């Protein structure tokens, strides 16, 4: 039963939402009202609408379908060349976008931080760019002979003029003897980067899995199966996250045969269907391919969470339960090994952080997955929301958040600022677009997209870094220096009086 004081807080937060909405014209207010709510315990849903186009004219943090395909799913595949097919301006999302760490020699056998563009000009819009794209792929294969394949990431003009990139892909694939994957991920498609994820997943299904089927049929799969093979999917190795996750999986006796897509390779994409279990970290961006693997190959899949010691231990046990007693015993040994280490981290940082509050606004999985990590440190989440979630994301979020938590979907810059002013959280955890706004308001901030150039945050080792970074953000002595001297003097005089 909800305590009376929490009932009051629910009502208070609902009133806050209505107050914030008053700034909009009636039509916009009605639209935005559906995306804002206060979570009430025992509800199976957060009660917000999602995956709907943003209200025209507002400041939204969303990206486009091209960003979802190139910047998230395909871009981190390190041994493929990813062509940004269109004007060079979209290159903002084309290189060094997400700190996807990888092992390899850039420009020789790895291309993760390189920018390849067809540099569309006006004449290409008029006459079409198929010949230019064909020549580009041929030249790139000569310049970088160790590439394993090419992906064509379409920008807006490609879809508008109707270039046949599929025909180019089939033709050039035969010429260079490597996979060439076309992606219709033009930025105008869909309402956010989420459709780009879906398009990217479908391209793996339609253009990569047939290669697996062919190799298996011809008995040419260079793969020795084991009963402990898993595919690690939806981890983009931001700051080394996938390595931290992989280390724990291997320590408990599992073999990671495919890592998608941070530090991943084309071969790992191809042999993904050979795994016994799919472990998905970022549900939003890769649940589509998990469902395809289940439908086509009968592969089971599960979402896991390696943020914070509480959820790490729970996830290790859930994963181990899918295997035999050997793996289950190993999981317990891994948990026992790291428990004293985590206790030492908590003993050091929890007293310094306990009682603080945080408001989250990120994409993907983090608005829910990082909640337990904050709670392990004694930090309470008072608001959370997604940039591009779907309804099932918000259903999954109910298992993570407390009663009276403010929920905001595709929150506008205005709304987020007003919520922060009213709730006065001690910390904001969001993205680069929000960072400097709140820092100028004198609020501690941590980036939850790129970890503010820190990390990893996954796994036991990552939690120690996470705790340190939250402590640095909240307890930095610089916060005592941001007040204007005349305001400090006035405050002292008032206190003395």
Curated annotation (Swiss-Prot):
Binding site for [8Fe-7S] cluster: 64, 90, 156
GO cellular component: molybdenum-iron nitrogenase complex
EC number assigned by the record: 1.18.6.1
Subunit structure: Tetramer of two alpha and two beta chains. Forms complex with the iron protein (nitrogenase component 2).
InterPro entries: Nase/OxRdtase_comp1 (IPR000510), Nase_comp1_asu (IPR010143), Nase_comp1_CS (IPR000318), Nase_Mo-Fe_asu (IPR005972)
Enzyme class of the recorded protein, top EC level: oxidoreductase
Annotated transmembrane regions: none
UniProt record, GO biological process: nitrogen fixation
Family under the similarity heading: Belongs to the NifD/NifK/NifE/NifN family.
Residues reported to bind [7Fe-Mo-9S-C-homocitryl] cluster: 282, 449
Gene3D superfamilies noted in UniProt: Nitrogenase molybdenum iron protein domain
Gene: nifD
Purpose: This molybdenum-iron protein is part of the nitrogenase complex that catalyzes the key enzymatic reactions in nitrogen fixation.
Keyword Protein biosynthesis: no
Official protein name in the record: Nitrogenase molybdenum-iron protein alpha chain
PANTHER family: NITROGENASE MOLYBDENUM-IRON PROTEIN ALPHA CHAIN (PTHR43457:SF1)
SUPFAM superfamilies: Helical backbone' metal receptor
